[in-house]
């Protein structure tokens, strides 16, 4: 009779996961097998319940040595695993614009899951994405009324780039294959996005990226624009980099240029007065498609449904995600001018016009979440609320001018970037130390380089704005 394996029970992990995981390993000839306990499975050969998850954009070893776990959320607050309330100063990752766990959205998702859990949109359809596309089109600048659904901002960008390459080919301009991005641009982590993006660390480990890509300079200029409220006065001439690239490569080789109207992830880089308008003029002059990456700026962040509409510059394509579903279900979208959409559709005599898509494009749960989110934005007037609060937010942010280490403050809409002087021996360390100090004291901020980026849910109250900047001011005093 074969003997049963010996079960060796380990001590439950300490810290934030102690109440969640119980781990057992089965010894058998020196190897370990997984044992299911209370619905959990221990990883083969390991006794660490955090080891399996390879975390994105994270120093995994440092995090897992001292984890910071969020276990629930409501309104303006997260709750940590040790029971503390954490005021959300970043809308999660620029995405929970209406606040957390809004029942209007979660109920819509539950209803959709119980009605139609999945339906393909390849050669079939279901009603929700058609309805959502109409609702989205109505929020876009005039003419951008054709909507393609994705599952993330990265997918939205790669979709937009592929559409931008398909359009000139459909028009018989097949030499237009070049894409233009910008230094310090962030356009997600797909191969298209990292290629047009201007962040070397996002490309370094992955080869050369797409061929035929060039970059304009960024607009960040502390020397001339420090402590600007709203649009900086200096730097519109940097848009002429696009004309320089036209002169270098030939307009007939350039398909599209992509920029974030406001670069959020790389430190709240706000466009100078006239910059976006000049880009639009150069694109018009040379027949170049202009793409605005509004994954961050869409859905109220700068006070309107889109930065394009709010700031009066209409691109040819807009990418979206994040606030589209209030981050309750992953979803992205691409809005395209009707005449450009029609050029692709009409270039094919029959059959599939664009060989591109995703299994989950227009997913029922995501579409339901999107519709409920748009309803909530409209019912509560959150875009207008962001505009109304912008002045108070701006004053509170700029009240930190003169505080220790601060070399610049930038604000627009309900966004702020607080730039810290880099520590000579350890660039980026100050912002990361402030990030940790804020979390330990009940405030979530975002550290990007030497910049603290802030973008609270649009439901933020003035007292909470005071708390955000008050804590930052207080905690900066303890940062070397």
PLM segments and residue spans:
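Short, positively charged and aromatic/hydrophobic N-terminal segments
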Residues: 20, 25, 31-40, 46
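Conserved N-terminal phosphate-binding loop of PLP-dependent enzymes in the Aspartate aminotransferase
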Residues: 43-480
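Polybasic, low-complexity intrinsically disordered segments
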Residues: 1-3
């Amino acid at each position: 009779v074969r003997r049963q394996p010996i079960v060796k029970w380990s001590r439950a992990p300490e810290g934030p996961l102690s109440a969640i995981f119980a781990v057992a390993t089965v010894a058998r000839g020196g190897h370990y097998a997984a044992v299911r306990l209370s619905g959990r499975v221990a990883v083969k050969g390991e006794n660490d319940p955090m080891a399996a998850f390879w975390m994105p954009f994270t120093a995994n070893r440092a995090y897992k040595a001292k984890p910071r776990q969020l276990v629930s959320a409501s309104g303006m607050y997260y709750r940590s695993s040790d029971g503390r309330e954490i005021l959300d100063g970043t809308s999660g990752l620029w995405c929970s614009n209406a606040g957390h766990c809004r029942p209007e959205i979660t109920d819509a998702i539950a209803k959709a899951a119980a009605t139609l859990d999945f339906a393909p949109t390849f050669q079939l359809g279901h009603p929700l994405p058609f309805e959502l596309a109409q609702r989205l089109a109505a929020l876009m600048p005039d003419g951008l009324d054709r909507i393609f659904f994705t599952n993330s901002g990265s997918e939205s960008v790669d979709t937009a780039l592929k559409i931008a390459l398909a359009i000139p080919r459909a028009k018989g301009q097949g030499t237009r294959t070049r894409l233009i991005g910008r230094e310090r641009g962030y356009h997600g982590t797909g191969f298209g996005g990292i290629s047009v993006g201007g962040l070397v660390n996002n490309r370094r480990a992955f080869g050369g990226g797409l061929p035929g890509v060039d970059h304009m300079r960024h607009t960040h200029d502390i020397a001339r624009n420090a402590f600007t409220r709203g649009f900086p006065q200096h730097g519109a001439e940097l848009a002429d980099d696009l004309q320089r690239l036209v002169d270098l490569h030939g307009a007939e080789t350039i398909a599209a240029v992509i920029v974030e109207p406001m670069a959020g992830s790389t430190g709240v880089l706000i466009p100078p007065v006239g910059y976006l308008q000049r880009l639009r003029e150069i694109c018009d002059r040379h027949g170049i498609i202009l793409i605005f990456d509004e994954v961050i700026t869409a859905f109220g962040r700068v006070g309107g449904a889109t930065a394009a509409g709010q700031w009066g510059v209409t691109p040819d394509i807009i990418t979206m995600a994040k606030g589209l579903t209030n981050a309750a279900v992953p979803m992205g979208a691409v809005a395209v001018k009707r005449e450009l959409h029609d050029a692709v559709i009409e270039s094919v005599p029959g059959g599939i016009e664009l060989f591109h898509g995703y299994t989950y494009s227009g997913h029922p749960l995501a579409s339901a979440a999107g519709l409920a989110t748009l309803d909530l934005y409209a019912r509560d007037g959150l875009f207008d609320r962001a505009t109304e609060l912008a002045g108070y937010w701006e004053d509170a942010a700029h009240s930190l001018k003169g505080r220790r280490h601060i070399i610049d403050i930038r604000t627009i809409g309900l966004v702020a970037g607080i730039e810290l002087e880099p520590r000579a021996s350890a660039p980026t360390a100050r912002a990361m130390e402030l990030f940790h100090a804020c979390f330990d004291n009940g405030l979530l901020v975002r550290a990007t380089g030497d910049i603290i980026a802030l973008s609270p849910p649009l439901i933020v109250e003035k007292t909470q704005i005071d708390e955000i900047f008050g804590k930052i001011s207080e905690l900066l005093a303890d940062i070397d």
